[in-house]
């Protein structure tokens, strides 16, 4: 049977005409596999900032509704270019602006939430084999004014569309090829995580994982949408963010290398429950101990987890004390590895 796939492309993925052509190749590869394909695009990188600057030159107290009207033009440009390119390379495609679907939002300008997506026309268009290219980051409110969804609004758009059209897959293309234990742009020994639960992802996001905003992960969790995070720059497998434990039988990742200033701490046999990682890391961060890389291996029985993370060597004694004092966690073994 036909799969429905939602593909979302971030600003750097559509940041130039060359990149847009590359993105259209990616889109066409999904379409050739006989999928129904829905595309969500952000504005070309840099464009939104230019628009923000223009508004500041007009007034440092720029009208909020006009601000959203101004900003929403960014995605209109990228979606028209993508749809135009798809047509050029032989695929039926058209752009859909948020108000044409419509995507209905509630809440204040610049921080609206998507309430519902009226998807009937869109579904009909998908049945004809067309590829809709939809503006991320925006919608219309009950007064028919354009609204924007705040940070990472395009992810929210993708997740809500996936929900309302009952998509089989939601794939978020970005400039990193998945979720890493720490920012791969800063640490070359960051490890990619193949599969991660929403709850762990929420903890990772607060640990500075730049891949997805916590609100988007929360949306995905609430609506039970599995998300694949991939890079549009390299064709490598990404990270699956999911809630189904069936995918967890294979061990996620094993081992992180500790560097000369880092110490590695492994806590084995931690009783696995939602938020367990947070209850370990919170006291550490409150005491200014920076947790750098986190690796979690769920045990085969699914009830326990092994947690490995790195901290600065100087913090080792302090960290050990906080873990041992922590009444919220039970574990079997605590070990340290210092280079």
Question: What does each of the following model-derived ranges do?
Answer:
Residues 41-48, 180, 229-246, 303-305, ...:
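Terminal amphipathic helices with adjacent charged low-complexity linkers/tails
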Residues 96-98, 230-232, 294:
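Conserved beta-strand termini and adjacent loop/short-helix elements that scaffold enzyme active sites
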Residues 126-141, 204-228, 263-265, 269-273, ...:
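Electropositive, surface-exposed helix/loop patches at the edges of structured domains
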Residues 161, 167, 219-225, 229, ...:
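Structural preference for solvent-exposed beta-strand-turn elements
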């Amino acid at each position: 049977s036909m799969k429905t796939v939602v593909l979302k492309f971030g600003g750097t993925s559509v940041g130039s005409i060359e990149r847009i052509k590359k993105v259209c190749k990616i889109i066409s590869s999904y379409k050739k596999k006989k999928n129904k394909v829905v595309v969500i695009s952000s504005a070309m990188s840099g464009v939104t900032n230019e628009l923000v600057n223009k508004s500041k030159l007009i007034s440092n107290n720029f009208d909020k509704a006009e601000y959203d009207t101004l900003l929403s033009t960014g995605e209109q440009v990228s979606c028209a270019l993508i749809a135009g390119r798809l047509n050029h390379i032989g695929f039926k495609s058209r752009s859909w602006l948020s108000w044409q679907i419509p995507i209905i939002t509630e809440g204040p300008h610049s921080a609206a939430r998507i309430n519902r997506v009226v998807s009937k026309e869109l579904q009909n268009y998908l049945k004809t084999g067309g590829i809709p290219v939809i503006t991320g980051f925006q919608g219309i409110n009950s007064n028919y004014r354009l609204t924007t969804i705040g940070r990472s609004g395009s992810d929210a758009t993708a997740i809500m569309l996936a929900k309302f059209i009952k998509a089989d897959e939601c794939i978020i293309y970005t400039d990193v090829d998945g979720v890493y234990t720490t920012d791969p742009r800063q640490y070359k020994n960051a490890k990619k995580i193949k599969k991660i639960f929403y709850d762990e992802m929420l903890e990772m996001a607060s640990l500075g994982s730049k891949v997805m905003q916590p609100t988007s992960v929360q949306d995905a969790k609430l609506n039970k949408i599995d998300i694949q995070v991939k890079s549009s720059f390299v064709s490598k497998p990404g990270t699956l963010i999911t809630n189904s434990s069936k995918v967890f039988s294979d061990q996620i990742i094993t081992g992180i290398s500790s560097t000369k200033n880092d110490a590695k701490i492994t806590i084995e046999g931690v009783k696995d429950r939602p938020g367990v990682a947070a209850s370990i890391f919170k006291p550490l961060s409150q005491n200014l101990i920076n947790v750098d890389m986190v690796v979690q291996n769920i045990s085969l029985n699914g009830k326990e987890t092994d947690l490995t993370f790195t901290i600065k060597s100087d913090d080792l004694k302090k960290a050990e004390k906080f873990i041992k004092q922590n009444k919220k966690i039970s574990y079997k073994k605590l070990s340290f590895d210092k280079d």
